Amino acid sequence: MKLLTVAGPPSSGKTSVILHLARVLRECSGLRVGVVKFDCLSSSDAEAYEKQHIPVRVGLSVNLCPDHFYISNIEDAMQWAASAGLDLLAAESAGLCNRCSPHIRDVPAICVIDNLSGSRTPEKIGPMLKFADTVVVTKGDIVSQAEREVFGRHIRKVNPRAGVVFVNGITGQGTMSLLRQLRFPEFDTLQDRRLRFTMPSALCSYCTGQTRIGRGYQMGNLRKMDFGGAENDR
């Protein structure tokens, strides 16, 4: 069983990249690809996968941290994929916060980021870019060559080890270049394997449903800012 993790900010083009990758793998290697989509409140991506006859399951974390929800269900997702006779499972994570850390050691890891998000955005994205094997840049056809080069330089500044590939989410151009960078080891199970980096910390009173504001309601794993004195701000 082959596994691939695909992470990135919302609306960066993760689903489009997976759709093109699944098509190329099917046409070139005869591999049957399935997808497990992890999201927070809602997702309509299942329709896009089903339209291309790609088996898909969608999990919504609702009021839980999407990262913790993801890692608690990825082993079960692999078992589903194996029982469905799939050759490769692509795990698409929600990527709702830049502290998300979905990549697993030895499992090929992609981070998708779009070129319209700002030239310094790569520096603001945490483990899902820093620990990725390959960074896929989408929407690069909308910006200039100079902007693409600056964006790529900022990516390499954060993760100099990763390959950087530009993929057109509409036409699929660049998908073959992406495929050439990927290596898919076989896994029977993820039992006892480790994440590449720790997940966002928990647990505070707001994690468990507290909605009131004030120091008296703030308990658990908290971090307070030091604003210093205000004398020089007057």
Q: What positions do the PLM features span?
A:
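Short, solvent-exposed amphipathic alpha-helical segments in soluble enzyme
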Residues: L21-R23, E50-Q52, G126-K130, F151-R156, ...
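Short, surface-exposed amphipathic charged segments that create phosphate/polyanion-binding patches used
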Residues: Y70-D76, M176-E186, S205-Q210
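P-loop NTP-binding site
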Residues: K2-S16, R23-R26, P185, T189-R234
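Inter-motif core of Ras-like GTPase G domains
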Residues: G95-L116, K124-D133
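Conserved beta-strand/loop subsegment of P-loop NTPase cores
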Residues: G34, P108-I113, L129-D141, R156-T171
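Short, glycine/polar-rich helix-capping loops at beta-to-alpha or helix-loop-helix junctions
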Residues: S42-A46, R120-I125, E147-H154
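Nucleotide-state-sensitive switch-loop elements of NTP-binding domains
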Residues: K2-I104, G118, G140, Q173
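Canonical P-loop GTPase G-domain recognition
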Residues: D141-R196
